[in-house]
Structures are given as structure tokens and as C-alpha cells.
Curated annotation (Swiss-Prot):
Alphabetical keyword list: DNA-binding, Nucleus, Repressor, Transcription, Transcription regulation
Key word DNA-binding present: yes
GO molecular function, one term: DNA-binding transcription repressor activity, RNA polymerase II-specific
GO biological process: regulation of transcription by RNA polymerase II
Source species: Homo sapiens (Human)
Name of the molecule in the record: Max dimerization protein 3
Transmembrane segments: none
Amino acid sequence: MEPLASNIQVLLQAAEFLERREREAEHGYASLCPHRSPGPIHRRKKRPPQAPGAQDSGRSVHNELEKRRRAQLKRCLERLKQQMPLGADCARYTTLSLLRRARMHIQKLEDQEQRARQLKERLRSKQQSLQRQLEQLRGLAGAAERERLRADSLDSSGLSSERSDSDQEELEVDVESLVFGGEAELLRGFVAGQEHSYSHGGGAWL
């Protein structure tokens, strides 16, 4: 952006110089030599007179250089018009007004770029803050998950212990019922045998 701004400044100075020269030429007081401050008059060496052909050649070279410079300035201005939002009436702009608008446009772009950098920096800081919060939440979630797994493990161990105690009690009850049931069966058999023997003995006595 800075090289473009410096180029615009150079073009602006050139356009101001050209317009000043054109106004001076229109009013008839254009001065080809720079203004000299009053001071002591120095003797000037007389230059030898030049031939008319040499003067014409120097003038033609100067005109050719001026023509090339104007053509280059025109090409730069055309490229500048393509890069600026001028609208439909861009043909009405003079060189000086076009360069001034270009300078204002560059300043506007620089301001936008600065605001964009500031916004980018704020967004980067916000992203870092959110990243830290996310890491903290992940740590809390991991701790909660480990606590839940530990609680589930303790619950499952408690249930296994209770189930083992219950199974042991049921086994003892089954054994006791089996023993008591066998003893009752033997007792009933013994009583039945006694009654049978008594019945046979009574018949013999009769």
C-alpha cells in the first residue's frame, strides 16, 4: 500500500505542475526558467551561437521526451481509473481531481486495513480464551467420567457381594430342608414299620 501511495503522490505533484504550466501558458506569462533572487550581477560566459539545425534537433528531442512522459502519465491514469470506484461519470474527472480521489481512496483502504487488523487481533484473543475454556471443560468432563466409572465399579462390587451372601443363605436353607426332609421321611418309615409289626403280632396272638 505504501509504494502505491508514494506513486500517487508523485503523480499528484506532476499533475499539479502540468496544470500550473497550462494555466501560465494560457495567461501568457509562462516562465521556462526558475525565478532568481535579486543579487549581484555575475558575468556570464557567452555561448557560441548554435546552428539552426542543432536548435531544431534539441527542441525535437525535448518534445519527444515530453510526449513520452505524457503518454506514460496517461497510461498510469487509465490503470488508476480501472482500480477505483469512480462510477459512470469518470470521464469528467481531471487529472488533478482523479489523483486526489485516488489519494482519498488509498487513505480509506488503509483505515479499513487497520480496523481489519484490530478486529483480527480481537478475534484471535477471543479464540484463545474459548480454547482455554474448552480445555477446562474437557478436564472437568474427564474427571466426572472417571468418578462415574468408579461409582459404578463400587456399586457392581457391592451387588456381587450381596448376591454371594444371598446364594450362600439359599444353599444353607436347601441343605437344611434336605436333611430335615430326609429325617422326617425316615421317621415316617420307622413309624409305619412299627405299626405293621404290631398288626402282625396281634394277629398271631389271636
